[in-house]
């Protein structure tokens, strides 16, 4: 019986080890509530100031993104809307958010047994963010940041309530969206790159914006407002929510 029990426990541990490639901790340091979103796993969670949400991401997860929604109101059924980052009017996101939203993107256990991850401003900016491995290592396995006052300094043509749109969202087309082949930076994308050099500023900004860590031995942390305050022009208190589901 002892052998069978030990074998069962070993098998269970092996299954857990195989299933989850990384734990991702999402923390809200903003002085207002953020409704975190995560797809294709996780869904969504209300995070008051100082709260944390832990996501267990399976091996092989790809095209994954985490973002913060602001100015949300949800009812007890998890339906409502957000000023930025809304994902179809639901608390539990199954699709991507509506720009603008600062994105933490990742793909786990890809070729060469590496995790690939980045901060992207291709969908614009709404909340300052840090994305970091919990145990940094050599090469491109280190913390990355986008904490500039982008909302306050946003060009007038890109400014929207609660955030700053990427020019691809605002104007579309090959020049800004790289829809028909290679394209380079523009004066508007350089606005983002100058302030957040770690982050994607346009769709083909790969060389300076993609980071890697060893897969299976690295966990991650996403922090909204790592410095505690978003920027002087962003409201310190967002509208109260009736959402009681995910407190």
From Swiss-Prot:
Highest taxon of source: Eukaryota
Stated induction or repression of this protein's expression: By abscisic acid (ABA), salt, salicylic acid, wounding, and fungal infection.
Disulfide pairings: 30-225, 72-82, 87-93, 141-213, 146-196, 154-164, 168-177, 178-183
Swiss-Prot/TrEMBL keywords: Disulfide bond, Signal, Stress response
UniProt xrefs under PROSITE patterns: THAUMATIN_1, THAUMATIN_2
Residues annotated as signal peptide: 1-21
Entries under InterPro entries matching the protein: Osmotin/thaumatin-like_sf, Thaumatin, Thaumatin_CS
Family: Belongs to the thaumatin family.
Protein name as it appears in the record: Osmotin-like protein OSML81
